[in-house]
């Protein structure tokens, strides 16, 4: 039966398995492959490239979400908001380098007070009238 609505699948494939599940990923390998082909990055795209790229993207997303979840927990919140993403990215040296020129809407800025603006610390010496030294 040629030209039917088989969708290009091999005949007799009982349990079809996605490339994402084969690779053990949550990110869609098929969609990444399609975007690599349509993006005019190269004439041809190898079979391993979208799997690798999907794995890298999944790792980066998991890393950012873990740090943002920690920031939300530090602020006693149960929901991650853009402020938590901003704090997570800017406090991590490598993520800040990677996403240095990225603006996060509603992210705010990192809290920072210059040392010259902080109140002076007065040294408290133990040499007073109540000193017990001999």
From Swiss-Prot:
Phosphorylated to form H2AS128ph (gamma-H2A) in response to DNA double-strand breaks (DSBs) generated by exogenous genotoxic agents and by stalled replication forks. Phosphorylation is dependent on the DNA damage checkpoint kinases mec1/ATR and tel1/ATM, spreads on either side of a detected DSB site and may mark the surrounding chromatin for recruitment of proteins required for DNA damage signaling and repair. Gamma-H2A is removed from the DNA prior to the strand invasion-primer extension step of the repair process and subsequently dephosphorylated. It holds the Pfam family Histone. One of its GO terms (biological process) is DNA repair. The record marks 120 as: Not ubiquitinated. Keywords: Acetylation, Chromosome, DNA damage, DNA repair, DNA-binding, Methylation, Nucleosome core, Nucleus, Phosphoprotein. In contrast to vertebrates and insects, its C-terminus is not monoubiquitinated. The nucleosome is a histone octamer containing two molecules each of H2A, H2B, H3 and H4 assembled in one H3-H4 heterotetramer and two H2A-H2B heterodimers. The octamer wraps approximately 147 bp of DNA. This is Histone H2A. It comes from Aspergillus niger (strain ATCC MYA-4892 / CBS 513.88 / FGSC A1513).
């Amino acid at each position: 039966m040629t030209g039917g609505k088989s969708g290009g699948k091999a005949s007799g494939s009982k349990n079809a398995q996605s490339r994402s599940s084969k690779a053990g990923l949550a990110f869609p390998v098929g969609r990444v492959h399609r975007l690599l082909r349509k993006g005019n990055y190269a004439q041809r795209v190898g079979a391993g490239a979208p799997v690798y790229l999907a794995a890298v993207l999944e790792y980066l997303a998991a890393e950012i979400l873990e740090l943002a979840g920690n920031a939300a927990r530090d602020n006693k919140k149960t929901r991650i908001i853009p402020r938590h993403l901003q704090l997570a990215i800017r406090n991590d040296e490598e993520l800040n380098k990677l996403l240095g020129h990225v603006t996060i809407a509603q992210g705010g800025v990192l809290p920072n007070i210059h040392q010259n603006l902080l109140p002076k610390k007065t040294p408290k010496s133990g040499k007073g009238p109540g000193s017990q030294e001999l």
